[in-house]
Regions:
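Residues within well-ordered alpha-helical secondary structure of globular protein domains
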Residues: 28, 36, 85, 115-116
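Short glycine/proline-enriched coil/turn segments at helix->beta-strand junctions
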Residues: 39-44, 60-64, 118
Length: 118
């Protein structure tokens, strides 16, 4: 079993950049780029979401997600709720937060962070 999870908080309600998770970068929306980079780290990855539109996208593209309360004041709160739901079934020793607007994060950074948590 993997002892590390990467959680990516994503929501549509950004005021400075509306609909940011669906901003196209090439052929894919930003949220998919972030997921792909995190997935390449070989850790378990989930999107922590609160919007039905994002849920529909995740379902249509087989991206693992956890629905959370839309009233969370921060991505960290969203991650906390998602983790509590996931840990009803699986326990993780290490939790890594990758922001949903980091499409160019390299999986090596995620792996390096995890190595330094030992």
């Amino acid at each position: 079993m993997n002892d590390t999870i990467v959680l990516i908080p994503v929501r549509l309600q950004a005021t400075r950049f509306p609909n940011k998770p669906f901003a196209k970068i090439g052929d894919l929306p930003m949220l998919h780029y972030v997921y792909n980079a995190a997935f390449k780290s070989n850790f378990d990855v989930f999107l922590a979401i609160c919007d039905e539109e994002i849920r529909d996208y995740c379902q249509n593209h087989q991206l693992p997600f956890v629905m959370t309360d839309p009233n969370h004041p921060s991505g960290s709160d969203r991650i906390g709720e998602a983790l509590s739901k996931i840990e009803e079934h699986t326990h993780y020793d290490f939790i890594i937060n990758v922001q949903g607007d980091m499409p160019f994060i390299n999986q090596n950074y995620i792996q390096s962070l995890r190595s330094n948590l030992e």
